[in-house]
Amino acid sequence: MTANALGGPAPVLPPNQTPPGGVTSPRTGPAVPRGRVRDLHPGWFASVMGTAILAVATYLNPGNQTAMQGAAHGLGAGLAVLAYALGAVMTIVYAVRWARYRDAALADLHHPVLGAMHATLPGGLLVLAVMTSVVGPQLLPAGAVTALIAVLAALGSVLAVVISVAFAMTLFVGAPPAASVNGGWFIPPVVTIIIPMALTPLVAHVGPGTARLLLALGYAAYGMGFLLFLMVLGLLHDRLVLHPLPPAQLAPTLWIGLGPVGVAALAPLALARAGQDLFGVAAPSVTVLSQLFGTAIWGFGLWWLAIAVTLLVRYLRAGPLPFHLGWWAFTFPLGAYTVATVTLARSWQAPVLEGVAVLLYLALVGFWVVVTARTVTATHAGRIWHR
C-alpha cells in the first residue's frame, strides 16, 4: 500500500487500474481518438447528471422570488439544452465503446472504484427524464415530452437494474479489500431510487391499469434502491471508522451520499402525487406520510452534508485535490439535495427551509462552474483522456 495525502494507506486497487478520473500516465499530449473511446472513463455521464439536476434546480427558482421567475425558467431551459446535448454525445460514445471495446469496458466494470461509475449512464438517462418532466414543456410539444420521458425512463430503468446487479456480482466474486470501499458505491443505489421519479410523470398519460403498474414498479424500485443505499452506507461508515481516510483522489466520492438522501426524500412525494386518483380516500394520508418520511430522510442529509464539508476541508488542508472526472460527484448529489430542500420547503410552507435551499443552490452553482471549467480545460489540454 502507498500512503495517501492524510497519512493513511491508499485503497488496494487491481493492477493497471487507477482511481476515478485516472492518474495521468507518463504520456504527454492528447491520445488518439480510438484510444480515447477505448479508455473512456465510465464516469463521463456524471456530467450529464450534474448539468440536468442544475437545470431542474434553476427552473424551480430557489427562493421563490417572483422577479426571478422568468430568468430562472430561461436559464433552466438553457441548461436543459446543454444537458440534452451532453447526453446525446455521451450515449453515442458509450455505445461505441461497449460495441467495439467490450473487454476494456468489462475490465472497468470489475474495478472497485470505476465499476460503480458505469451506473452514471442509466443515471444520466433517468435524470434527463426527470428534467424533461420539469423543463421539457417549455422546450418541446406535449406529445414529444411524454414520448421522450417514456423512452428515457424505460431504457434508464432497465440499465439501472442490470448494472446494479452486474457491479454487485463483481464485488461478491472479486472479494475486494475493505479499504477499497468508497462513496462511488452509492451510485447504483441512487440511480435505482431515481426510477420512480422518472416513471411518475407518465402516470397521468396512461390508463388505470398501466398507472397502477407504474406506481407499483416505482415503489418497488424505491425499496430496491433505498435498501441498497442503507447497505452501502453501513459499509462506508465502517470503512471510514475502522480504516484511514481514503486518498485525496476519492475525496469527491464522499459527497455522493447526498444523492440517495435527496432522491429518497423526493421520490415518496412524487409517488404520492401521482397516485392521488388511485389511492382514493387514503390519498391524503399517503401524502402526509410521504412528506414526513421525506423530511426525516432530508434531516439525515444535513448530518451527511456537515461530514462531507468537514472532510473536504481536512483534505484541502493536506494539499490540493488532483482534478479528475470524479469531481462531478460534487454536483448531482448536492443538486438532488437542493431540489429536495426546495420541494420540502414548499410542502411545509417554511420560508426558513426556502432560505436553506437558496444557500444550497448557490453552492451547487459554484461547484458546477468550477468543475465544468476544469473539465473543459483538461479536455482541451488532453489530460482528461489519460488513464
What are these regions (language model features)?
Residues 297-298, 354-370:
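Small-residue-rich transmembrane alpha-helices that serve as helix-helix interface/gating elements
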Residues 49-56, 80-83, 87-94, 127-130, ...:
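Helical transmembrane-bundle signal
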Residues 285-346:
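Extended, compositionally biased non-globular segments
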Residues 94-102, 130-143, 169:
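Transmembrane alpha-helix boundary signature
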Residues 64-70, 206-215, 275-286, 315-319, ...:
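Extracellular/periplasmic helix-loop-helix junctions in multi-pass membrane proteins
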Residues 2-95, 100:
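N-terminal signal-anchor module of multipass membrane proteins
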Residues 28-60, 76, 80, 102-130, ...:
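Juxtamembrane helix-loop boundaries in multi-pass membrane proteins
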Residues 151, 155, 182-308:
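Generic multipass alpha-helical transmembrane bundles of integral membrane proteins
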